[in-house]
A protein has these predicted regions:
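C-terminal accessory/binding modules appended to enzymatic or scaffolding proteins
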Residues: 6, 10, 19-26
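A structural signal for short beta-strand/turn segments enriched in small hydrophobics and glycine
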Residues: 21-30, 35, 58-67
Length: 71
């Protein structure tokens, strides 16, 4: 079953901590977003393998935008 990591708020990607093909665990940090002058660490929702990373460093993201797909 696929799981998506969504941006909880609009902001700018300041770090991408995982790559396509990585094995990840629930709770692991995946992406760091700068929003309202605060860095927000977005975590992996479930164990799995990264199927796709849809954002890159300095990308602007919208609220609820899909950033990563986990299989």
């Amino acid at each position: 079953m696929k799981k998506e990591i969504l941006s909880p708020m609009p902001g700018t990607v300041v770090d991408v901590l995982i790559s396509k093909g990585d094995k990840v665990m629930e709770g692991q940090d995946a992406v760091v977003i700068d929003a309202m002058k605060m860095e927000n660490r977005i975590q992996v929702p479930a164990d799995g393998t990264v199927a796709d990373v849809l954002v890159a460093l300095k990308d602007k993201v919208a609220a609820n935008q899909v950033m990563v797909v986990i299989e």
